[in-house]
Curated annotation (Swiss-Prot):
Organism: Neisseria gonorrhoeae (strain NCCP11945)
Presence of keyword Transferase: yes
Function per UniProt: Catalyzes the specific phosphorylation of 1,6-anhydro-N-acetylmuramic acid (anhMurNAc) with the simultaneous cleavage of the 1,6-anhydro ring, generating MurNAc-6-P. Is required for the utilization of anhMurNAc either imported from the medium or derived from its own cell wall murein, and thus plays a role in cell wall recycling.
Gene: anmK
CDD domains on file: ASKHA_NBD_ANMK
Record GO biological process: 1,6-anhydro-N-acetyl-beta-muramic acid catabolic process; amino sugar metabolic process; peptidoglycan turnover
PANTHER family hit by this protein: ANHYDRO-N-ACETYLMURAMIC ACID KINASE
EC number: 2.7.1.170
Reactions listed under catalytic activity: 1,6-anhydro-N-acetyl-beta-muramate + ATP + H2O = N-acetyl-D-muramate 6-phosphate + ADP + H(+)
Protein name, entry field: Anhydro-N-acetylmuramic acid kinase
């Protein structure tokens, strides 16, 4: 497939944009990806737009049942799509590109409800508006098709991780630490699979916001001042989600701040609770990998959690010498770019009619072409 550049030059490879805003709700990442049909060639640029505090509060409010939810969700979808369009425009400008240079834009949207047990997952984005604002063919609503085929609708990234990061000689694990942590297991000679291991940054961020009025614990500075509370850690690890077989997925519906508070007596040191939450994330990841990929010796990490040295130290301590920890940067993809790049890749799969569904990870009955497309 060829496309025209702003200078009218015909190119044989294609450019895609992926836009992702995750459960941390900190902002929107956009990544520029070059493809040759369904073949990945590389990521070439990135832009990030932080969420204004007001927008973030509105999104968090929508996590809980309340009045006028339908109207609020539609208005927020429009506001988000304007922010996504701004992020895409900044990315194009930074790369000296025009909208006609882009074959398609893949947009995940902002998850506000994830209920696979009821067959739905809600990501806010006004996709026709986004196509109109960007003047780029837009693909979105990626999770619904997998859910319709009986899957969890999550995680969607194992197929992308498989396409980029598989090693033909040994099992690799890819760990994404966003608000929720998820793993992709890439065994040689067998289909990839994966699942949500539990909270990633979500509880740590929520605790930091509640007790220090900061968006997150930068560089793990607050957690580093605390000590692990063994009894609290044990109670958190006893949650039945962690003993459920995969495929499985989770979200704020299960692991919110009010859930954590049911395990507290109110007298705990705030630094100690935060330190315990870091170990909680690390231990649940370690337990999941030990159960699902006991032969894995390498784990590649992406997502915002990689910037937290306390969490990284906890992971290293939990795994010991059994598994070596690496950044996806060692596999030529910046750890902050991976998730957004995945949705550019899924848009390319849609354009080329390639199933992008990791049905072995989600539990869907068959591979599916994910998403719906909107012309501008």
């Amino acid at each position: 497939m060829a496309f025209c550049t702003s200078l009218g030059v015909m190119m044989e490879t294609q450019l895609y944009i992926g836009i992702m805003s995750g459960t941390s709700m900190d902002g929107a990442d956009a990544v520029l990806v070059r493809m040759d049909g369904g073949k990945w060639l590389g990521a070439e640029g990135h832009a990030f737009t932080p969420y204004p505090d007001r927008l973030r509060r509105k999104l968090l409010d929508l996590q809980d049942t309340g009045t006028d939810e339908l109207h609020r969700s539609r208005m927020l979808s429009q506001e988000l799509s304007r922010l996504y369009a701004q992020t895409a425009a900044e990315l194009l400008c930074s790369q000296n590109l025009a909208p006609c240079d882009i074959t398609a834009l893949g947009c995940h949207g902002q998850t506000v409800r994830h209920a696979p047990e009821h067959g739905y997952s809600i990501q806010l984005a006004d996709l026709p508006l986004l196509a109109e604002l960007t003047r780029i063919f837009t693909v979105g609503d990626f999770r619904s098709r997998d859910l319709a085929a009986g899957g969890q609708g999550a995680p969607l990234v194992p197929a992308f991780h498989e396409a980029l990061f598989r090693d033909d000689r040994e099992t690799r694990v890819v760990l994404n630490i966003g608000g929720i942590a998820n793993i992709s297991v890439l065994p040689p000679g067998a289909p990839a699979f994966g699942f949500d291991t539990g909270p990633g940054n979500m509880l740590m961020d929520a605790w930091t916001q509640a007790h220090w009025q900061l968006p997150y614990d930068k560089n793990g500075a607050k957690a580093a001042q605390g000590n692990i509370l063994p009894q609290l850690l044990g109670r958190l690890l006893a949650h039945p989600y962690f003993s459920q077989p995969h495929p499985k997925s989770t979200g704020r519906e299960l692991f919110a701040l009010n859930w954590l508070e049911t395990y507290l007596d109110g007298g705990e040191n705030r630094y100690d609770v935060l330190r315990t939450l870091s170990r909680f994330t690390a231990q649940t990841v370690c337990d999941a990998v030990s159960h699902a990929a006991a032969d894995a010796r390498q784990m590649y990490i992406c997502g915002g959690g990689i910037r937290n040295p306390v969490l990284m130290a906890d992971l290293a301590e939990c795994f010991g010498t059994r598994v070596s920890l690496h950044s996806t940067a060692e596999l030529n993809l910046d750890p902050q770019w991976v998730e957004a790049a995945a949705f550019a890749w899924l848009a390319a799969c849609w354009i080329n009619r390639i199933p992008g569904s990791p049905h072995k990870a989600t539990g869907a009955s068959k591979p599916c072409i994910l998403g719906a497309g909107y012309y501008y």
